[in-house]
C-alpha cells in the first residue's frame, strides 16, 4: 500500500508525514585491484545507471579508467558517466586517508569535510542527490578499493547526514 501525505493508511488514518527522501541507492566503488570488466559487472550487479566520478583529476594509468575511455565504455553498457571535480580530494590531502584510524586519518577526513562546505561542493552533492531521486542506483567512484581509505566515504556520510536531517 502506498503511503505519503494525504494517502489513507490501512488503519483508516491519513498519513500526514511529508515525503521522506532516502538515498540508499547511492554506493561507493573503487577500481583498485579489479579489471575493467569486473568493475562494470559490479556496477551492473548493483543496478547502477549512473557512475559519478569523484576524482579531482579523472585520469588513470590503469587501462580503461580515464575519463573519456571510461565514459565511452560505460555508455556501451547503458551506464551514464558524470565527473564531479568539485567533489575531488586534493593531492595534498590524500596521504592521511591511508593511515586508517590515526590522527592523520582523522585530520584528512576533517579537512575534506571542510571542503564539502564550499558552495561548489554543496551544489555537486545536491546534484548527486537529484540523480539518486531519478535513477535506480548511483555509484560514486574513486580509485581506492577500501572506502575507509577514500574520501568517497566522507561524501557518503555527508549525504546520509543530509538525508537524516530531512526525516
Language-model region placement:
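Compositionally biased, low-complexity intrinsically disordered regions
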Residues: 2-4, 16
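Residues lining hydrophobic/aromatic ligand-binding pockets adjacent to catalytic sites
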Residues: 10-167
Amino acid at each position: 500500500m502506498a503511503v505519503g501525505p494525504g494517502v489513507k493508511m490501512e488503519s483508516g488514518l491519513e498519513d500526514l508525514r511529508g515525503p521522506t527522501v532516502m538515498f540508499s541507492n547511492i554506493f561507493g566503488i573503487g577500481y583498485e585491484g579489479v579489471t575493467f570488466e569486473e568493475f562494470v559487472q559490479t556496477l551492473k550487479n548493483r543496478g547502477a545507471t549512473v557512475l559519478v566520478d569523484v576524482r579531482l583529476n579523472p585520469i588513470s594509468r590503469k587501462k580503461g579508467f580515464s575519463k573519456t575511455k571510461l565514459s565511452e565504455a560505460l555508455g556501451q553498457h547503458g551506464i551514464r558517466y558524470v565527473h564531479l571535480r568539485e567533489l575531488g580530494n586534493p593531492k595534498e590531502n590524500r596521504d592521511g586517508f591511508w593511515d586508517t584510524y590515526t590522527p592523520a586519518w582523522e585530520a584528512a577526513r576533517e579537512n575534506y569535510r571542510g571542503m564539502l562546505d564550499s558552495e561548489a561542493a554543496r551544489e555537486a552533492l545536491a546534484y548527486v542527490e537529484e540523480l539518486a531521486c531519478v535513477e535506480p542506483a548511483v555509484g560514486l567512484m574513486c580509485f581506492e578499493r577500501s572506502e575507509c581509505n577514500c574520501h568517497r566515504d566522507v561524501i557518503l556520510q555527508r549525504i546520509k547526514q543530509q538525508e537524516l536531517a530531512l526525516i
